[in-house]
Amino acid sequence: MRRILFKSKIHRATVTQADLDYEGSVTIDRDLLRAADIVENEKVAVWNITQGTRLETYALEGEAGSGVICINGAAAHLNKPGDLVILATFAEVEEAEVANWKPTVVFVDKDNRVVPGQTKEIPGPQRRSA
């Protein structure tokens, strides 16, 4: 049996652009794609923290070091510049690999730059009590 598991995410990125007239997709800074192990054309979930919307699209590579997170096409109606989003991917994993599976989590600052050394999520209740 194969299971679909969380593969990687870019956590709390800031939308820098929303281009309604583009065909679709989300353009992501190449440095962030590499850090999160996301490849161009890979299916990406976009969870908008600010608006509460969710959608699926695919990744396009943006200029390295630019910090770009550009929501393209019709999805631009649901995501505006300044919104905080989570960009997530999933992978099919063989049952034998599930116990040792480790997703990649990338935290970014307000300029969509990778925050070095911060790689582990803290569950909500633990975070609030700390």
Curated annotation (Swiss-Prot):
<dbReference type="InterPro" id="IPR003190">
    <property type="entry name" value="Asp_decarbox"/>
</dbReference>
<keyword id="KW-0210">Decarboxylase</keyword>
<feature type="active site" description="Proton donor">
    <location>
        <position position="58"/>
    </location>
</feature>
<keyword id="KW-0670">Pyruvate</keyword>
<dbReference type="GO" id="GO:0015940">
    <property type="term" value="P:pantothenate biosynthetic process"/>
</dbReference>
<feature type="binding site">
    <location>
        <begin position="73"/>
        <end position="75"/>
    </location>
    <ligand>
        <name>substrate</name>
    </ligand>
</feature>
<dbReference type="InterPro" id="IPR009010">
    <property type="entry name" value="Asp_de-COase-like_dom_sf"/>
</dbReference>
<dbReference type="GO" id="GO:0005829">
    <property type="term" value="C:cytosol"/>
</dbReference>
<dbReference type="GO" id="GO:0004068">
    <property type="term" value="F:aspartate 1-decarboxylase activity"/>
</dbReference>
<feature type="binding site">
    <location>
        <position position="57"/>
    </location>
    <ligand>
        <name>substrate</name>
    </ligand>
</feature>
<keyword id="KW-0456">Lyase</keyword>
<keyword id="KW-0865">Zymogen</keyword>
<comment type="subunit">
    <text>Heterooctamer of four alpha and four beta subunits.</text>
</comment>
<dbReference type="Pfam" id="PF02261">
    <property type="entry name" value="Asp_decarbox"/>
</dbReference>
<comment type="pathway">
    <text>Cofactor biosynthesis; (R)-pantothenate biosynthesis; beta-alanine from L-aspartate: step 1/1.</text>
</comment>
<protein>
    <recommendedName>
        <fullName>Aspartate 1-decarboxylase</fullName>
        <ecNumber>4.1.1.11</ecNumber>
    </recommendedName>
</protein>
<keyword id="KW-0068">Autocatalytic cleavage</keyword>
<keyword id="KW-0704">Schiff base</keyword>
<feature type="modified residue" description="Pyruvic acid (Ser)">
    <location>
        <position position="25"/>
    </location>
</feature>
<comment type="similarity">
    <text>Belongs to the PanD family.</text>
</comment>
<keyword id="KW-0963">Cytoplasm</keyword>
<keyword id="KW-0566">Pantothenate biosynthesis</keyword>
<feature type="active site" description="Schiff-base intermediate with substrate; via pyruvic acid">
    <location>
        <position position="25"/>
    </location>
</feature>
<comment type="function">
    <text>Catalyzes the pyruvoyl-dependent decarboxylation of aspartate to produce beta-alanine.</text>
</comment>
<dbReference type="GO" id="GO:0006523">
    <property type="term" value="P:alanine biosynthetic process"/>
</dbReference>
